[in-house]
Every structure is written in structure tokens, then in C-alpha cells.
Amino acid sequence: MMIKVKKETMRACLSCSICDNILRDATTISECLHTFCRKCIYEKITEDEIETCPVCNIDLGSTPLEKLRPDHNLQDLRAKIFALKRRKVKAPGIVSLPGKRKERSISSLVVSTPMVSAQAGTTRRRTKAPTRKELRNGSLAERTVKKEESSGDELLESTSSPDTLNKFTQNKRQSKKSCKESISNKENKDGDEPWDSKMDWKPLNFLVEVANGTKPLKSSASQGSGSKSEHANVSRNQFQGSKTKTKNKKRKCKREDDKSNNGDPTTSETVTPKRMRTTQRKRSATTLGDSRNLPQPDESSAKQERRNGPVWFSLVASNDQEGGTSLPQIPANFLRIRDGNTTVSFIQKYLMRKLDLESENEIEIKCMGEAVIPTLTLYNLVDLWLQKSSNHQRFAALVGSSAKDFTMVLVYARKLPECNM
């Protein structure tokens, strides 16, 4: 639905309150939503140093420029209603290029050119490059010649009379002749040696021969640097000597081992060190099969296991108890004590509680028919039981079978009163 609205009413809505013109780059304050031209509001804030809105004086904080936002909707509406007037620029007319002029060379402009420079360039002979010594000695003469040439060129530019040109060419020729004579005299003094003979071609020839593979590297190194090769040979000989020494030592050790294995202990003991002797003793003990040495580690290991592990034993009431009433058999006759360092008096206290006795001194414990001291530890008691058992025999047992035949048996009975004489 189309509605006709006057431009004046729209102009009032789309105009800036600072410059009273139609908005250009509409910019709105986010706090109060008043819209201005971007240029106008920026200049107002920065130049007048205000921190409030120019219309409603609302506070914009310490950074008012951050509260400004571009309003694209108003800008699009302004572009549709009040289109920007574009200036019509007249197209530039066709500029006619000037006619081409004939270019003249620089040589045609010069009236007279001196012929001395051309003659000097053509009459110079090509000579071989001089050595460093010649360059050092002839540097002063060349500098003087260059100075004269530069001064001569300046004179040529300034003067063009034939008399001055002739004088200059004569002076220049004389200076060149003197310079050549001095260089030739120095060459004669050096001994008329050719330039090629003075050059040292040895390193280049050596590189060519090495690249072609015709000459070995060792011979050239020995000829070129004698001191370095001698030093390298000495170090190689020392390294080879140390290698041979270590090899000889290894061979000697192997021979001594072979002799000791064959049965010559006297010779090996006199020559071999202490470490070799200990290893030979161990080998001889294992090879000969000495029965006395073999069970020793087993016994020590078994003893160590007994010292660390618990102690199993069985308590049995004595059948032939003299005197008063005999002690009954306790129900749990197989017992285990974790700490083997406990004394026999601990077993006496256990029996006193089980049998309801008044004192532990009423009980006497025997092992293998002999009375046991109450202060004796269980580990020592096990050692005594093993010593008195039958000939240290080994018995085969299956895993899970009864250990009744392998446990220590302790017999308890009522202690007889001591008779006072």
C-alpha cells in the first residue's frame, strides 16, 4: 500500500540536529538513540570535549566515542528518499599529440672532437697481467699517469687549440715511455724469469692426480707436509701398539684358563691375579664335584628360611607321668608361632591357660626326651631338634600331603618337685 508523504516531514526526521542538514553517514548514540551526522558528532565530542548527548544531555561516560554506532537503516532510507546529487564532470577533450621531431645524435652536435683519446685507446698493447710485486712497485707510477690523464682530459675539455693539444700528447707519450722503462728494468733485475715459472703449480697438479686416481694420498701427504705425516704416523703406531697389547693380554688370560682347566693349578696361581684365582677355584669346585661343598649353600639357605618363617610344632601329653595326676591332651595339638624369636616360656603360659593351672612353673616341656630351658628361643629349639634327628636324611613329600612326620614334637608333663637333700 503506497502512501504519499511530503518531503518536508521526512526531511525533519532525517536531518541532523547539529548542522540542520540531511544526515550524512547516520550515526546513533546507543544510550539515547539520537542520530547525527558522523562528522558532526565526532567534531562536537572531540573539539568541545563534551561527555553528554547534545540533545538530551544524557551522560555518555568517560569514553563517549565508544557509545556511537552507525545506523544503516536510516542511511538506506535517506539514500532512497533524498538521493545524493552527483556532480557532473565534463569529459576531457582529446588532446592532440605534438608532431614527432627528428632526434639528432650527440656526435652530430659536437663540432670538433679530439683524436688523442682514440689513439691512446688503440695504440695500447695487450700485455700479460703483472704479478703482485710488480703491481706494488708500479702503483706509484700508475697513479701519477692517471692523474696526468685526468688533468689532460680536463684540459681537452677546456681548450681546443692545436698547440695545446700537441704539447699535451708529447707529455703523455714521455710519461708512458718512462713508466714502461721502469717496469722492464725491474723484470731484468728479477732474473728474466718467465711468469709461468714463478707460479706454484704443485698443489694444482696434486689435486688433478688425486681426482684422476693416479697418485695415492699417503705419498703426496708425506711430500707436502712432513711434520704432520710424522705426527700422524706416531699416533697410529701408538694406537696399534695399544691394540696389540690388549690382544696379547686377552690371549694370555685364555691360555691360563686352559691350563687351569687341564689341571695345572700351581702355574696359574703364580701368574694370574686374585680375581682369576677366585673364579678358578669356583670352577674347580664345580668340575671336580666335591660333595662337601655342594650342600653348604643349601643348608645355609634352609637355615635362613627357618629364621625368617614361622615355626610349626605339635604338643603331645606325656604318657608316663610320675607322681600326681597326669596332664590331659589339649584338643589342638598342631600349633604355629609366627615369631620364632619367642621363648619356650610362651608355650608354658599357653598350656597353663588351656589346662587351668595356677603357674607356668608346674609344666615341663621336653624335646627328643630331654628337658628344655624356658629361656630358649624356638629357632634354637628347631636347630637342636634337627641335630638330634636321624642323620639329616631327606624325605620326598607330595604337595598337599600331611606334614605330621616332618613337624617337631614337644612333650609336656607335670614338673616334679625338686627334692631338697
Swiss-Prot record:
Disruption phenotype: No visible phenotype. Drip1 and drip2 double mutant shows delayed growth and development, but increased tolerance to drought stress, compared to wild-type. It catalyses: S-ubiquitinyl-[E2 ubiquitin-conjugating enzyme]-L-cysteine + [acceptor protein]-L-lysine = [E2 ubiquitin-conjugating enzyme]-L-cysteine + N(6)-ubiquitinyl-[acceptor protein]-L-lysine. PROSITE patterns: ZF_RING_1 (PS00518), ZF_RING_2 (PS50089). Residues 106-198, 216-307 are annotated as: Disordered. GO terms for biological process: protein autoubiquitination; protein ubiquitination; response to water deprivation. GO terms for cellular component: nucleus. GO terms for molecular function: ubiquitin-protein transferase activity; zinc ion binding. It comes from the Eukaryota. Expressed in roots, leaves and flowers. Residues 218-227 have a biased composition (Low complexity). Its EC number is 2.3.2.27. Residues 244-253, 274-284 have a biased composition (Basic residues). It is found in: Nucleus. Pathway: Protein modification; protein ubiquitination. Transmembrane segments: none annotated. A zinc finger (RING-type) spans 16-57. Interacts with DREB2A. This is E3 ubiquitin protein ligase DRIP1. It comes from Arabidopsis thaliana (Mouse-ear cress). The lineage of its organism: Eukaryota, Viridiplantae, Streptophyta, Embryophyta, Tracheophyta.
